[in-house]
């Protein structure tokens, strides 16, 4: 196997025996085969679009299928086999609809054999892709960057589409990018531009998702969220999917269950319509994804995982674990969606009601969420005045993905060392390194503001652009430093968005992507001053200099 799409890839060079995420070589092979088939579907979709034939089914399918291949989403070989079958079926249906002679390339005509050799077929197409690296390693690096960025973009677009927010330009570019992966006539500069186009498209996908969330559930408002459980039966919802969380809340109304969020669903508590409509959405349980084996084992109720990050489940809790959407693990309960895209959560609800729930109370603890762009920009005048009066010296955006590497303690130490006249904005699961720190406030402004989920990088961008406009300066002139952590492909998409916007001086860690060559990193460093983190002390001093 060959996989280097996540930050924890083995020895920083790539997983070759078994995935650091827990993915087997067999699952990796069928994932590679699915991506290969999607690359063959893409030119057919683009031709159909050119002729005015509807490609909506293919576009939505492509998004979910790419999402399923992301790190810590789906480990179920049978589910990937079905995705591959569906991909070929959709491709051939579109060819029939095109109904004219087309000189399709070999990849558009590929027919997998659905037998015991499926894994070997996946391994073969992976080797074919890897062999391209010998031609130009830097271009191969950019191809992988585009692929991984498109996976992240597709995941955000998947959630936006669930909420009724769609843009044909996003769908079209995802297909164009996939089709480009089979081209060998593009220059290094062409691939750089394509990677930046991924960033541009991802910005639009995040904008669509923000519109879907805020038009459906209201703009987030600063909200206190309990970290201590309350007495009673309980159900835990993990992942990112706020639409599915809302469906769970609707189906559990008047059951007596208390609903807790886990991981990246913490920001859901900031959406006013959810809180007003569903009072049994109570608190948050656990911390970041890599601690789930401990958190899930202790939780005295059923658990539903809506998106990444899923780790290989332990036998102590596998019977109370349920997955939906693109998420899966062989042998774990899967709740399929109906034609409206919503699962019947009855099995999970019944499991939760059969379990003891919380029987003892704990000391109350709370954290604040809800500092998205609408809430922050409403107090822009207060922020500007505080900066002008010297009360606020600097802003730090410290966020991104969390992970299990010891080096990630850097982010905790960094936030702890930030001077008291500075404000920390945070987002995504990287916040769990410090989300419960009591940093105090500057006047009426809390020094630690949770902007939201990883897709709420869009909110952080809007805040930065809004403040730059208010100060009548460029974003790169703001007293703002970005200290980012990455783990999976959504983070790659967000990084490409920031580079597309021309944002400079980003510090990235805990390690650099294995798929980025030294030459490519040098190019990014020279163009954007992208740099790796060093120590909290050195980086703080440099940012404040």
UniProtKB/Swiss-Prot annotation:
EC numbers for this chain: 1.7.99.1
Any GO MF annotation of the entry: metal ion binding
Record-stated family: Belongs to the HCP family.
Keyword terms of this UniProt record: 4Fe-4S, Cytoplasm, Iron, Iron-sulfur, Metal-binding, Oxidoreductase
Function: Catalyzes the reduction of hydroxylamine to form NH(3) and H(2)O.
Compartments in which it is found: Cytoplasm
GO terms of biological process kind: response to hydrogen peroxide
Top-level EC class: oxidoreductase
Free-text remark on how the cofactor is bound: Binds 1 [4Fe-4S] cluster.
InterPro entries attached to this UniProt entry: HCP/CODH, Hydroxylam_reduct, Prismane-like_a/b-sand, Prismane-like_sf, Prismane_a-bundle
Modification Cysteine persulfide occurs at: 401
Protein name: Hydroxylamine reductase
HAMAP family xrefs: Hydroxylam_reduct (MF_00069)
Residue sites binding [4Fe-4S] cluster per the record: 3, 6, 15, 21
Cofactor field: [4Fe-4S] cluster; hybrid [4Fe-2O-2S] cluster
Catalytic activity: A + NH4(+) + H2O = hydroxylamine + AH2 + H(+)
GO cellular component: cytoplasm
Annotated residues for binding of hybrid [4Fe-2O-2S] cluster: 240, 264, 309, 401, 429, 454, 488, 490
Keyword set includes Cytoplasm: yes
Membrane spanning stretches: none
Pfam families: Prismane (PF03063)
């Amino acid at each position: 196997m060959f996989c280097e799409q996540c930050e924890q890839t083995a020895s920083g060079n790539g997983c070759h025996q078994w995935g650091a995420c827990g993915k087997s070589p067999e699952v990796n092979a069928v994932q590679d085969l699915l991506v290969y088939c999607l690359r063959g579907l893409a030119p057919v979709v683009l031709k159909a679009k050119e002729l005015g034939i509807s490609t909506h089914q293919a576009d939505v399918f492509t998004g979910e299928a790419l999402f399923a291949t992301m790190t810590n989403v789906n480990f179920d070989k049978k589910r990937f086999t079905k995705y591959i079958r569906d991909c070929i079926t959709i491709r051939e249906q579109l060819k029939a609809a095109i109904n004219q002679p087309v000189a399709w390339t070999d990849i558009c005509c590929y027919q997998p054999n659905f037998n015991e050799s499926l894994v070997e077929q996946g391994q073969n197409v992976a080797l074919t892709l890897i062999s391209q690296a010998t031609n130009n390693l830097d271009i191969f690096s950019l191809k992988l960057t585009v692929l991984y960025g498109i996976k992240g973009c597709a995941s955000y677009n998947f959630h936006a589409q669930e909420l009724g927010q769609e843009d044909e330009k996003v769908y079209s570019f995802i297909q164009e990018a996939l089709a480009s992966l089979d081209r060998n006539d593009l220059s290094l500069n062409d691939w750089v531009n394509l990677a930046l186009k991924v960033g541009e498209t991802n910005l639009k996908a995040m904008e669509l998702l923000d519109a879907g969330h805020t038009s459906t559930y209201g703009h987030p408002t600063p909200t206190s969220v309990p970290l201590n459980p309350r007495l009673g039966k309980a159900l835990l919802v993990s992942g990112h999917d706020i639409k599915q969380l809302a469906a769970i809340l609707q189906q559990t109304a008047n059951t007596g269950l208390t609903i807790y969020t886990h991981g990246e669903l913490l920001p859901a508590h900031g959406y006013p319509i959810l809180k007003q409509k569903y009072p049994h959405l109570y608190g948050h349980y656990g911390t970041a994804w890599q601690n789930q084996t401990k958190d899930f084992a202790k939780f005295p109720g059923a658990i539903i995982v809506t998106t990444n990050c899923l780790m290989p489940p332990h036998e102590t809790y596998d019977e109370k674990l349920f997955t939906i959407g693109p998420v899966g693990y062989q042998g774990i309960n899967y709740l399929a969606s109906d034609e409206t895209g919503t699962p019947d959560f009855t099995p999970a609800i019944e499991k939760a009601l059969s379990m003891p729930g919380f029987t003892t109370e704990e000391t109350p603890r709370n954290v604040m969420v809800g500092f998205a762009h609408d809430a922050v920009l409403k107090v822009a005048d207060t922020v500007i005045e505080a900066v002008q009066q010297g009360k606020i010296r600097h802003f730090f955006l410290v966020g991104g993905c969390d992970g299990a590497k010891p080096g990630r303690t850097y982010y905790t130490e960094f936030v702890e060392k930030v001077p008291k006249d500075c404000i920390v904005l945070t987002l995504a699961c990287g916040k769990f390194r410090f989300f419960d720190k009591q940093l105090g406030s500057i006047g009426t402004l809390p020094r630690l503001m949770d902007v939201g989920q990883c897709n709420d990088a869009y909110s952080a961008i809007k805040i930065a652009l809004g403040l730059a406009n208010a100060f009548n300066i460029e974003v790169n002139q703001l007293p703002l430093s970005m200290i980012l952590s990455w783990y999976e492909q959504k983070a790659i998409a967000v990084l490409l968005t920031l580079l597309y916007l021309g944002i400079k001086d980003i510090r990235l860690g805990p390690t650099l992507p294995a798929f980025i060559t030294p030459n490519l990193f040098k190019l990014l460093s020279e163009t954007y001053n992208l740099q790796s983190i060093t120590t909290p002390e050195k980086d703080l001093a440099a940012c404040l200099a």
